[in-house]
Amino acid sequence: GCCRFPCPDSCRSLCC
């Protein structure tokens, strides 16, 4: 699954 919005910097490269 993807990160929540707004997504944290640590997840931004994964799904944002």
Swiss-Prot record:
The keyword Methyltransferase does not apply. GO terms for cellular component: extracellular region. Expressed by the venom duct. Its main location: secreted. It is found in: Secreted. Keywords: Disulfide bond, Secreted, Toxin. GO terms for molecular function: toxin activity. Disulfide bonds join 2-11, 3-15, 7-16. Belongs to the conotoxin M superfamily. The cysteine framework is III (CC-C-C-CC). This is Conotoxin nt3a. It comes from Conus natalis.
